[in-house]
Amino acid sequence: MTSVDGMTVFNTDQVDTTKQTMFFGPPLGVQRYDKFRYPIFDKLTQNQLGFFWRPEEVSLQKDRADYQTLNKAQKHIFTSNLKYQILLDSVQGRGPGMAFMPYCSIPELEGCMNIWQTMEMIHSRSYTHIIKNVYSDPSEVFDKILEDDKILARAQSVTKAYDDFLNVAQEYGTGNMWRDGWKESPTARWEINNLKRNLYRAVANVYILEGIRFYVSFACSFAFGELKLLEGSAKIIGLIARDESQHMTVSQHILNNWKKDDDPEMKEIAMEEEENVYNMFRQAVDEENLWAEYLFKDGSIIGLNDKLLQKYVEWTANKRLKSIGLKAIFDTPISNNPLPWTAHWLSSKGMQVAPQETEVESYLIGSIKQDVKKDTFAGFQL
């Protein structure tokens, strides 16, 4: 048991964090990264640190000229997707730290969320970098984001689960049910269950956001890159996509741990919320399909149209469902990628670029091979 009754920035009690649940355990004390309950979160932290990059490393000199050659339909596709991605990363640039970290009770997940939020901030800076280099007046994009009805309509479903959890958590924190004398009362048990249920929904929402909602925009950016247009922007989006894959994996492991032995109450909630999660997926796919129609209302890009994008969204959603132990419910089978050419953009190893020309996406910072044996270099001669 901990003597801490409430929240603290530094817990002076001795707590074995290898035996704690991911959330709602005792407050954290010493940040130590030598032993873990869930080593995968430290691995994901190391990956993100190794992938660290800055948007200024990618040249956008050609993109400004390319943008001027686009027709009206293509400019609509490019600009609308930028606006939507700015919305998503504005949410994720503060969401994990604002909503999840205050209730995190293992250091490896806390550290993972710290770098997660930092990388999302870099994504937001990247959109500013693109806009400042491509558009003569950046305000034409930024100032119109909150005037776009299509963007605002999607913002509500993207942020609702976050906001619901934040409001429930605030009410719980300002009440008395978390105090030692009240914790075991029926009302307190209901309140903590409701709090955990809202956390589950918020994390599921983030998994869908990171794993599905970005991908229509990604595919459009890569389609321009395939046509040798706006290649600098496409490379930046490729770097962002690589990061988002890591962030999706964080939320995926949180959800899967709850289905196992992390927290018995969360395991029950996961079972009870299964149909709700399916409905969240259905809503996201429906909204992304409508977004694809809106993007291509004036015309398509060579190699890409709204119908192909809609199949791609379904294919992606089925993959995400399977990764959290749920069944595929959409028509496009996992075995048939409708946009196979996107694969090399989403895989940093598939990007073949000259180092002097652009950012090398497969380059890792601080990556060291530690399993070298005494005979590893036996075949080498000087």
What are these regions (language model features)?
Residues T2-L382:
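Non-heme di-metal
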